[in-house]
A protein has these predicted regions:
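Short histidine-centered beta-strand/loop micro-motifs
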Residues: 21-25, 42, 48-49, 67
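Short, conserved beta-strand element in jelly-roll/cupin
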Residues: 25-40
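Ligand-binding loop in jelly-roll beta-barrel domains
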Residues: 60-79
Length: 79
């Protein structure tokens, strides 16, 4: 799927430095990673590495831990 077709480049941008924090998704989020490297570990699940140019979706209700290995910038969209 082409990124411009789903409007990725019109989505807001979020940035975060190297860090580790818990997160819970109250609603579905789709994001496109512009820069950085992240390991997202769902509570009770296996870690998933997310890197530059990955398009990922997180379901509503997901509880996880974000471990940002290198500063991240991403486009994101809720719903």
């Amino acid at each position: 799927m082409k990124l411009d077709v789903i409007g990725v480049y019109d989505w807001p941008i979020w940035s975060k430095e190297v860090s580790r924090f818990p997160w819970k998704y109250d609603q579905k989020e789709t994001c496109y990673i512009l820069e950085g490297e992240v390991i997202v570990t769902p509570d009770g699940g296996e870690p998933v590495k997310i890197v530059e140019n990955d398009l990922v979706s997180f379901p509503a209700g997901l509880s996880c831990t974000w471990e940002i290995l290198s500063p991240v910038r991403k486009h994101y969209n809720f719903g």
